[in-house]
From Swiss-Prot:
Keywords: Isoprene biosynthesis, Lyase, Metal-binding. Pathway: Isoprenoid biosynthesis; isopentenyl diphosphate biosynthesis via DXP pathway; isopentenyl diphosphate from 1-deoxy-D-xylulose 5-phosphate: step 4/6. Belongs to the IspF family. The lineage of its organism: Bacteria, Thermotogati, Thermotogota, Thermotogae, Petrotogales. Binds 1 divalent metal cation per subunit. It comes from Petrotoga mobilis (strain DSM 10674 / SJ95). This is 2-C-methyl-D-erythritol 2,4-cyclodiphosphate synthase.
């Protein structure tokens, strides 16, 4: 069955935190990172929600609550755990992933390839099926007002129950 998944996440900037997008550590112009219970990788969090949504399995918080077990955990591990969870119930073939990253101060153009490669490796998916685009937000919203980063993710895939 052809299904679509949609994910969204937002994290505020914070001092004394790392800034990670799609497993890539970035230097923010003001030295900020992203606040979060895990490593705060807002890209992987939106991707996880999109995958779960495509499979009708709820949201990231249902599987990875704010507990000691997941405190400061790498979001790439959370993504791997999500794939394992999905693969126990479904055979999934992802057609494509499309992602919008909104931030006034973080330009993703130099790291798009790295994010796509990281995502491709974890999902075992061709890089050509992953599209990323950065937007400034034009002074609107959390990303546009430079309070944090917002990510929207859409996935189209074929899903069959095991």
């Amino acid at each position: 069955m052809l299904k679509i998944g949609f994910g969204y996440d937002v994290h505020p900037f914070a001092e004394n935190r790392r800034l990670i997008l799609g497993g890539v550590v970035i230097n923010h112009p003001k030295g900020y990172g992203l606040l979060g219970h895990s490593d705060g990788d807002v890209f992987f969090h939106a991707l996880i929600d999109s995958l779960l949504g495509m499979c009708g399995l709820g949201s990231i918080g249902e599987y990875f609550p704010e507990s000691k077990e997941f405190e400061n955990i790498s979001s790439s591990i959370l993504l791997e755990k999500t794939i394992d969870l999905i693969n126990k119930r479904y055979i999934v073939k992802i057609n494509n992933i499309d992602v919008v990253i909104i931030s006034k101060s973080v330009n993703i153009s130099s790291i798009t390839g790295q994010i796509k490669n990281n995502t491709s490796c974890i999902l075992n998916l061709e890089v050509s099926r992953i599209n990323l685009k950065g937007k400034s937000g034009n002074g609107l919203g959390v990303g546009g007002n430079d309070q944090g980063i917002e990510v929207y993710c859409t996935i189209l895939g074929e899903i069959d129950e095991i």
